[in-house]
Amino acid sequence: EVSSIAMSGFYGQSFLERANYKDLVQDCLHAMKVMNAKVAFLPLGGIKAGWEKIPALRTEVVKRLKEVGDMAASEGVVIGIETQLDAKGDVKLLKEINSPGIKIYFKFQNALENGRDLCKELKILGKKRICQIHCTDTDGVTLPYNERLDMNKVKKTLDKMGWSGWLVVERSRDKDDVRNVKKNYGTNIKYLKEVFQ
């Protein structure tokens, strides 16, 4: 089973500036069909910071996300977007997009790095707006040793919300042993299973 297909090229390239964005998303939708994945991951990190405050740029982002969201919805799948906005900003953006094919792919790291209350952010978004979660933080320590991420509190919050789904481990590597993939991911997965299962 495949959790999601990532369009990670959009971390480095701007979804706003690519003329062929629909073709790129369509390629992802084809891959999803082949892999039987129900979620695509679309990070908006490649867009120049501050786009959400410039009306012309925001309008174009909303238009493009509505188009690709409707493409996804017509195939019975969802595109999960990652933004740097807070939860209220994400809710507002989703309302503007107004497509059942666009939801939030929530990343713990964004809330934590910006000093936001992670559990409060989850509650504001609510279970219906979150398609998947990057259960990860900045590299430094693995999840069991992360002092700013209370995973038990996160579990209680998600349970209270009634949310269930994929928790995708992306980073949270030991900074002194970042290349040891087996150790880092093995440690994180073991810990998540202890907390969530």
Region spans (language model):
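Active-site acidic/histidine proton-transfer and metal-coordination neighborhood
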Residues: S4, Y11-I104, A111-E113, K183
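A short, flexible beta-alpha/helix-coil linker loop
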Residues: G9-Q13, G46-G50, T138-V141, R173-D176
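Hydrophobic residues within beta-strands of alpha/beta enzymes
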Residues: S3-I5, A40, I133, L167
